[in-house]
Every structure is written in C-alpha cells, then in structure tokens.
Amino acid sequence: MLYVYMDGEFVPENEAKVSIFDHGFLYGDGVFEGIRAYNGRVFRLKEHIDRLYDSAKAIDLEIPITKEEFMEIILETLRKNNLRDAYIRPIVTRGIGDLGLDPRKCQNPSIIVITKPWGKLYGDLYEKGLTAITVAVRRNSFDALPPNIKSLNYLNNILAKIEANAKGGDEAIFLDRNGYVSEGSGDNIFVVKNGAITTPPTINNLRGITREAVIEIINRLGIPFKETNIGLYDLYTADEVFVTGTAAEIAPIVVIDGRKIGDGKPGEITRKLMEEFSKLTESEGVPIYE
C-alpha cells in the first residue's frame, strides 16, 4: 500500500480525499510538478521546486511552506513508501472556497504529494521510435494562459492528446497561434539537421527541466545548438526529431504526420543523448536515504 502526503498527514492512497469545493478540483486552480527519482536519488529536485514556486507566484498563489520544507516532504513521502525509482507529483491547490471564482475566498492552499513506482513511459518505443501528429488545437497563447505556468488546468494538453490518439499517434505536436512548432502534449521538442540541433524558445512552451539538462549535455558534447522558431517544414525535413520530459525522458520520433523522419529509425545523435542522459540520472540527484 502506498501513502499520499496531504496537508501534514500521510494517508493511504485509496483513502485520500479532496473536497468537492477545492478550487483545484472545481477550476484547475493550482499548480503541480512532475519529478523523477532514479536509484535512490531525486533528479533536479531544487529546479523542480523552484519552477513550482514560480508557477504559484504567477497565479498569485502563496505556498504556505518554504522550498526547503517542501523538498523534505517529498523525500519523506518517498521514504514512507520505500521507493527508489519513482514518479513524484507535488500539487498545490488554491484550497477550499465556494462555487464562485473569487480566489480570495480560498484561505488555505492544499499541499499534496503523490509518489508512484515508475518505469519507461513509452516502453519499447524508445527502441522503435514514436509516431507523432501535429494537431489542430493550438497551444495556449503566452498572453492568455502562459505555457510556462504548470497549472492544474491541462485541458489544452488533453485535447491535443485526444486528437493524436484518434489519428493513431503516440504523441501530439502543438503549433502556436502563429503556426510555429511549440511542444508535445507533455514534452519539449528538438530537431536534428546536418549534425546541428535546434529547439523552440520557451516563450510558447514549458521551460522544461529535462530540456535544460539535455541542452547542457548537447553543449558538453560540442554539438552545434541554437534556440530558434521551428516550422512544420523543419520537422518534415529533419534528420532526427526527439522530445524531452520528466516522464518521457528522451524519446525519438520517427514519423510525423505520416512522413518518415530521416531513415525512420531513432538517429545516432538522439541515441547518444539518451545514453548520456541515462548516465546523468544515475549520478546526479538528492539522496532519499541518508
């Protein structure tokens, strides 16, 4: 049996309950993170917590504990569940209010931490490669609901996933309102062409923690790299395409909109980055058990 942390208590996950008047439940009014633990270490915990607090600040939600206290709660939840390899979901909701929208009526934010054993999100597709679909639904505009706010309102992402599923894709690819490539339904996107790597700037997509780690690896390996706007033509004519995310890690895309990418197999640069990222997660992180 696994336990969930809920506002100061550890509760069996099958007994964990949220009020029907919690604005996180009613309106998606809250923020969250996705974090990974590998072999007893939490990968980039501080960076994830920094982003959680930035998301909260952006929606004027004050988290009632310090970052250090939040990180310790995450570690304690992992210990409580005796987990070494896990997916971690910290959540902060606006708290209990009424059926109106006014956030001032929510006096006490709710803090929840869920931890689950975790393996490979895409299974054998890391070897075969994913099929992706560019979807008709556009990514939330940065002047409406900025993608860099990791909010509980994920309907935009879910609509993209529904469309990709209906069209036989493993993953969706968003365009923004200007027609530029934004990101996947839950991951950032990279393009390899003639030995160089490009990725969209993060004004129209989430500033991914895994994205930043992969960029560090790219720079360390001396691979030419730049952030620039990417169009559909760049995807269709790429030598390699891959996505990065906490859950996905690095996943190769070999078909987009029915078009084979490169030779239709995970490319050499993508496979090298996957190997280096695996090494990084094995050696870096905050120890859970000390």
Swiss-Prot record:
| Signal peptide positions (record) | none
Q: Name the CDD domains on file.
A: D-AAT_like
Where in this protein does the record say N6-(pyridoxal phosphate)lysine is found?
Answer: 150
The top EC class is transferase
* A biological-process GO annotation: isoleucine biosynthetic process
What family does the database annotate? Belongs to the class-IV pyridoxal-phosphate-dependent aminotransferase family.
Q: Which gene encodes it?
A: ilvE
Cofactor(s) the protein requires to work: pyridoxal 5'-phosphate
**PROSITE patterns in alphabetical order:** AA_TRANSFER_CLASS_4
User: Pathway, per Swiss-Prot/TrEMBL?
Assistant: Amino-acid biosynthesis; L-isoleucine biosynthesis; L-isoleucine from 2-oxobutanoate: step 4/4; Amino-acid biosynthesis; L-leucine biosynthesis; L-leucine from 3-methyl-2-oxobutanoate: step 4/4; Amino-acid biosynthesis; L-valine biosynthesis; L-valine from pyruvate: step 4/4
What reaction is this protein's catalytic activity? L-leucine + 2-oxoglutarate = 4-methyl-2-oxopentanoate + L-glutamate; L-isoleucine + 2-oxoglutarate = (S)-3-methyl-2-oxopentanoate + L-glutamate; L-valine + 2-oxoglutarate = 3-methyl-2-oxobutanoate + L-glutamate
- State its Enzyme Commission number(s): 2.6.1.42
Q: What is this protein called?
A: Putative branched-chain-amino-acid aminotransferase
Keywords for this entry? Amino-acid biosynthesis, Aminotransferase, Branched-chain amino acid biosynthesis, Pyridoxal phosphate, Transferase
Question: Any keyword Phosphoprotein?
Answer: no
Tell me which PANTHER family the record gives. Answer: AMINO-ACID AMINOTRANSFERASE, AMINODEOXYCHORISMATE LYASE
What would you give as a GO molecular function for this chain, any one?
L-leucine-2-oxoglutarate transaminase activity
- Output the lineage of the source organism: Archaea, Methanobacteriati, Methanobacteriota, Archaeoglobi, Archaeoglobales
Q: What does this protein do?
A: Acts on leucine, isoleucine and valine.
Q: Give the matching Pfam families.
A: Aminotran_4
Matches recorded under InterPro entries = Aminotrans_IV, Aminotrans_IV_CS, Aminotransferase-like, B_amino_transI, BCAT-like_C, BCAT-like_N, Class-IV_PLP-Dep_Aminotrnsfr
Q: Which domain of life is it from?
A: Archaea
